[in-house]
Amino acid sequence: MGIVIGIICAFIIIVQFIIGNVANGFIALVNIIDWVKRRKISLVDQIITALAISRIDMLCSTFLIVLITSLYPDLNTAVNMVKISNNIWIVANHFSIWLATSLSIFYFLKIANFSNYVFLCLRWRLSKVVSVTLLLSLVLLLMNILIMNMHIDTWSDGFKRNVSFGFRSKNCTRFFKLALLINTTFTCVPFTVSMVAFLLLIFSLWRHLKNMQYHAKGSRDPSTAVHIKALQMVVVFVLFYTFFFLSLAIQLWTSESLEKNNLFYVTLIITFPSVHSCMLILRNSKLRQASLLVLWWLLCRSKDIQTLVP
């Protein structure tokens, strides 16, 4: 990677890090304040708040790992450092991904309209479905950490036996590609769940519109509007999720060293938790209204400061 591209990627990472933390911090703060005032919080606000906190954790852990490995590249070959950094990122990424997936499940079960008995049972127990989904995902998290640590130990043993297993060697590139393959494989599960929920929601909207046409009713009834609004939320999520998933998959097929393109791939990966959170604010009426109030307050403050300056 050229110096200019590296500087641009580093600048984008810093900007996304700031925007992502501000957006996610704003989401968490607004929902927590509303929770304290009302002394209750809805399921969707619980998911969004937990998602915002997990994304702050992911952004901070990713930024710190990149910063430490850039300033101290020799630590990349230290087994304990590799394990710690991998485990931290795996945990942060896991909760960020699975909470986002739980949000898509929520919209599907809450908005979609099917007469299937299983679907109705899941809708009636929506809170339990989300809780069980997150609990079952912990099994995948444990498996991901165990397999990754076994892979690191295998690489470490080979590194100790043979000096050619240096960090800049082809063997080390294979190590990172295999590690990436492991993480991408575990990311396939929530990605598939989200895609299924997305497709079923589209099918539900299509059936609903077909029924409206059959009964000679307009397509702008309340149920259709709710369907479309939920579908817009899920479409934005799926688009960014697909972008995130492809950014992981592309790294497996690149022929260049992962080290050379490290900043570029980090830029792609942190786009999802940063930009999608901004879209959540714009699409959520409560968060959008709170953000407009904050912007109005900042605008008034800036005008007051300008009038005080001679």
Curated annotation (Swiss-Prot):
The protein's role, per its UniProt record: Putative taste receptor which may play a role in the perception of bitterness.
CDD domains named in the record: 7tm_TAS2R14-like
Biological process, per Gene Ontology: detection of chemical stimulus involved in sensory perception of bitter taste
Family named by the database record: Belongs to the G-protein coupled receptor T2R family.
Record bears the keyword Glycoprotein: yes
InterPro entries given in the database record: GPCR_Rhodpsn_7TM, TAS2R
Name of the protein: Taste receptor type 2 member 125
Gene name, Swiss-Prot/TrEMBL: Tas2r125
Locations listed in the record: Membrane
